[in-house]
Amino acid sequence: FGVRGANGVILVTTRRGKEGKAKISVNSSVGIQMPTRMLEMADSYTYATLRNEIITNDKPNATENDLVFDNYAVERFRLNDDPIMYPSIDWRRYLLNKTSVQTQHNLNISGGTKDIRYFISLGFLYQNGLLKQFEGVGYDNNYKYKRYNYRANLDFDATKTTTLKIGIGGIVGNRNEPMINDATNSIWTLINQTTPFSSPGVIDGKLIVTPEERFDNKINLGNSALPKCYGTGYSTAINNTMNLDLLLNQKLDFITKGLSAEIKGAYNTSYGFTKKRKGQVEQFMPFYQSSLEDPSLGYDSPDFNKNIVYKIKGENKSLQYDETSSRAR
């Protein structure tokens, strides 16, 4: 609570204990978090059809070679009969849960005797993120936040005219989040920019990505959400803030009735610690076997082998470790 002071300043004071039996109060709440709105994005068939339509509108005599997606790819998207080679993924449903949980709990205890009074408060807040947990990464890749807060106010009547008030309080916050392998875009932006055919997802613990040569390098598949958040590591930050204040009040009624003197002291400290683990996993690109052995064969050839084989994209997986800490008083 507080009162309005001069120039509009609000003076806030924490609760203090009163003489009497101990009073205990407990408050708990559970909430459900969800996005206010989720965009509905085009599937692969709709995307490919409209993208080709743009070209034919600009160039009515366009041939199949002029199109971004050939007839075979469009048909695969339409039938959805080859989801590894020609996927159609709704990345919001694939990467995000519909809801997440938030909980908050508070415990207050107050009471005391004529000479000693106390007020103690403990609180806990937990917020879970919306990212789904990937299997096989070996760590928690979701957004999460835990906060612990505490407050203890003690009033001692050392004598009939001397009162000592001690207050200690603080907040400990623990934040976990994925290491997004993108310096400028958030996970939400990346999801909006990811095409539905850029990857079939994680299969048997392996990150599968669509090679750009699948569409003759006519479309950029690089700015995809999954490769930038799967196996890229995580960041944990701990922040600890503590406040201590002392007040000594001495009544001076022997000089003038109602006169008193106060001595105040305060000590504040804060500490921060951040741990970052950056990783990179192998990315596997699927190909039809005949596409690698004899690129001259067409899909409609009776000798065309549609067994799927994988090539590794980029370098092998690696791990980087970084820790930073800070302290202030």
What name fits each language-model region?
Residues 1-241, 247-250:
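Membrane-proximal, glycine/serine-rich, low-complexity loop/turn segments characteristic
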Residues 125-147, 177-182, 237-243, 254-329:
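Small-side-chain secondary-structure face that scaffolds active or pore-lining regions
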